[in-house]
C-alpha cells in the first residue's frame, strides 16, 4: 500500500472582518528627556576624572603587541616545576571550593526568612552584602598579611572569590530554602522520650 501523501498546509489568509491595530509610539515626557540629559552630563564630567585617552591607546597600541610577543615561543625547560605548581594550584582550588560550599550552608540557613526570625536573617544578609561589596583584592591583601604569601593565602582568596558568584554564594541558598517548609527540619530534632510525653499528659489532665 503506497504511503499517503500529506497535503501541504494552506497559506494563511486573514479574515475579511479582521482589523489592523496600530500602536501609537510612546510619548517622550520631560522627565525622560531630563534623565537622559543628566546621564550625558555625568558622562561628560567623568571624562576628565577617568583620564579617558583613546588617542593614546591608538598611538601606543603597538606596545601591547610587543609585550604579547615575548610570551612566544614558550620555554618548557623547567617543566617539572611547572607541573608541581599546577598541582599546587589544583589543590588550592579544591580546598577553596570546599570551604566555600561548607561555609555557605550555615550562612544560607541563617539567611532564610522561613527558617529563622528576622533579627537573625537580616544581620546575616547585611554581612554577606558587605562581604560582596568589598573587592577581592582587599581580602587577598588581608589574608597575605595574616598568613603570609603562600598556598594558604591562595586558598582563602579562592574561597572569597567562589563565595561571590551564585554557584556557591550563601545568598543563593535562601532563595531555594524559602520554598521549604519548616516542618521538614523536624526530622533532625531529637525524639522526645515516651515517659516525658506521659508525664506531661498526666499533668495536663490534673
Curated annotation (Swiss-Prot):
Q: What does this protein do?
A: N-terminal fragment of the PhnE protein, part of a phosphonate usage operon that is cryptic in K12 strains. Growth of K12 strains on phosphonate can be observed when it is used as the sole phosphorus source after a 60 hour lag period, suggesting the operon is activated. An intact PhnE in strain B is (AC A0A140NFA3). Part of the binding-protein-dependent transport system for phosphonates; probably responsible for the translocation of the substrate across the membrane.
Gene Ontology BP, a term: transmembrane transport
**Quaternary structure (record):** If the reading frame is restored, the complex is composed of two ATP-binding proteins (PhnC), two transmembrane proteins (PhnE) and a solute-binding protein (PhnD).
Output this protein's name.
Answer: Putative cryptic phosphonate transport system permease protein PhnE1
Q: List the disulfide bonds.
A: none
Q: Which GO terms describe its cellular component?
A: plasma membrane
Compartments annotated for it: namely: Cell inner membrane
Q: Does the keyword rRNA processing apply?
A: no
Species the sequence originates in: Escherichia coli (strain K12)
UniProt keywords (A-Z) are: Cell inner membrane, Cell membrane, Membrane, Phosphonate transport, Transmembrane, Transmembrane helix, Transport
Amino acid at each position: 500500500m503506497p504511503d499517503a501523501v500529506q497535503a501541504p498546509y494552506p497559506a494563511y489568509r486573514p479574515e475579511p472582518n479582521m482589523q489592523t491595530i496600530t500602536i501609537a509610539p510612546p510619548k517622550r515626557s520631560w522627565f525622560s528627556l531630563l534623565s537622559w540629559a543628566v546621564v550625558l552630563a555625568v558622562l561628560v564630567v567623568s571624562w576628565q576624572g577617568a583620564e579617558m585617552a583613546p588617542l593614546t591607546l591608538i598611538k601606543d597600541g603597538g606596545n601591547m603587541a610587543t609585550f604579547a610577543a615575548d610570551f612566544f615561543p614558550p620555554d618548557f625547560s623547567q617543566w617539572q616545576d611547572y607541573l608541581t605548581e599546577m598541582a599546587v594550584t589544583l589543590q588550592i582550588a579544591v580546598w577553596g571550593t570546599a570551604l566555600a560550599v561548607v561555609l555557605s550552608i550555615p550562612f544560607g540557613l541563617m539567611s532564610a526568612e522561613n527558617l529563622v526570625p528576622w533579627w537573625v536573617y537580616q544581620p546575616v544578609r547585611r554581612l554577606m552584602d558587605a562581604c560582596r561589596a568589598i573587592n577581592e583584592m582587599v581580602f587577598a591583601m588581608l589574608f597575605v598579611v595574616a598568613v603570609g604569601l603562600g598556598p594558604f593565602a591562595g586558598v582563602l582568596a579562592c574561597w572569597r572569590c567562589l563565595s561571590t558568584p551564585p554557584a556557591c554564594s550563601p545568598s543563593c541558598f535562601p532563595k531555594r530554602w524559602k520554598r521549604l517548609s519548616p516542618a521538614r527540619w523536624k526530622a533532625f530534632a531529637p525524639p522526645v522520650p515516651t515517659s516525658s510525653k506521659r508525664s506531661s499528659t498526666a499533668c495536663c489532665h490534673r
